[in-house]
Curated annotation (Swiss-Prot):
A Pfam family annotated for this UniProt entry: B3
Ranges annotated as DNA-binding: 139-230
One Gene Ontology term of the molecular function aspect: DNA binding
Subcellular location: Nucleus
InterPro entries: B3_DNA-bd, DNA-bd_pseudobarrel_sf, REM16-like
The name this protein goes by in its record: B3 domain-containing protein Os05g0481400
Record bears the keyword Nucleus: yes
Keyword Ligase: no
Matching PROSITE patterns: B3
Top-level taxon: Eukaryota
Region (Disordered): 45-68, 233-279
Length: 279
């Protein structure tokens, strides 16, 4: 019991000493004016918090019957019609006194040349190539549908391009047999003609199976000779020419037989004149 009473007395003495120390500290703070400063700071903080502007509420947009558009410009009607006037005027230009005009587009006829017609056109193109100046590089190209319709892209022989054309993009002039000039764009890294080839193909009605001879007349100029695979005028005239040749051969053989026979009668008319010409 005595021990407990002693511990209680010690605790009470400690609390009394602590209370005195707190009072002395408060008095010391009052002497320094720190207590008043802390109160003024608390009041200023409360005043600033109360006067802070409250955030404005967001406006609620009402969705109407009209379509919502992000762009502020006026809506224009959509047109799916392509305009090639400026492109065609760039593609085709005529030299000298020739008429300057733009060629309108044509629908693909769908006509496909047979294998024999393609081979005949290719061989004629090779013969024409052999008659050109050997100093000018040249090659023969047979047209397929992608060259003359749809994409209008003409790939050139890779070996020819590496030997005679620079590996960059630049303008080239396509000149036909009549001297007509068409501006085109050669793409070196793809070894082909793109811009301008469309106008040349449409102007000359190129079709699948046609053979073209490309002669590099100048570093930036191709002279192009066209051999049509399906030529209606030529096809109509061929049978007549063959018949005339056959009649001529028959008449010549008859004249020779009559001349060789011992009892041959004197020739009259046309056969006599033909035989006299041969002698």
């Amino acid at each position: 019991m005595a021990a407990e009473a002693g511990s209680a007395a010690a605790g009470a003495a400690y609390e009394e000493e602590r209370r005195k120390r707190v009072l002395e500290n408060l008095k010391h703070l009052e002497d320094l004016g720190i207590k008043k400063m802390s109160k003024s700071l608390l009041e200023a903080a409360r005043l600033q918090k109360s006067t802070r502007a409250s955030p404005k509420p967001r406006k609620k947009f009402e969705v109407g019957a009209t379509e919502v558009r992000r762009s502020s410009r006026a809506r224009n009607s959509v047109s799916y019609k392509e305009n090639f006037d400026e492109l065609n005027s760039f593609l085709c230009r005529r030299r000298g006194s020739r008429i300057r005009s733009t060629e309108q587009g044509r629908d693909y006829t769908g006509r496909v040349a047979s294998y024999e017609q393609q081979q005949r056109a290719f061989k004629k193109a090779e013969r024409l190539q052999n008659s050109l100046d050997p100093e000018n590089p040249s090659f023969v190209k047979t047209m397929v549908r992608s060259h003359v319709s749809s994409c209008f892209w003409l790939g050139l022989p890779t070996r020819f391009c590496k030997l005679h054309l620079p590996p960059k993009e630049y303008k080239m002039v396509l000149e036909d047999e009549e001297g007509g000039e068409f501006d085109s764009v050669y793409i070196g890294n793809r070894t082909g003609l793109s811009g301008g080839w469309r106008g040349f193909a449409m102007h000359h009605n190129l079709e699948d199976g046609d053979s073209l001879v490309f002669e590099l007349a100048e570093p930036d100029r191709f002279k192009i000779y066209i051999i049509k695979a399906v030529d209606e005028d030529a096809n109509e005239s061929e049978p007549a020419d063959e018949e005339a040749i056959g009649d001529k051969d028959t008449s010549t053989e008859d004249a020779a037989e009559q001349d060789d026979s011992p009892n041959a009668e004197p020739l009259k008319g046309t056969k006599r004149r033909k035989l006299r010409g041969r002698r």
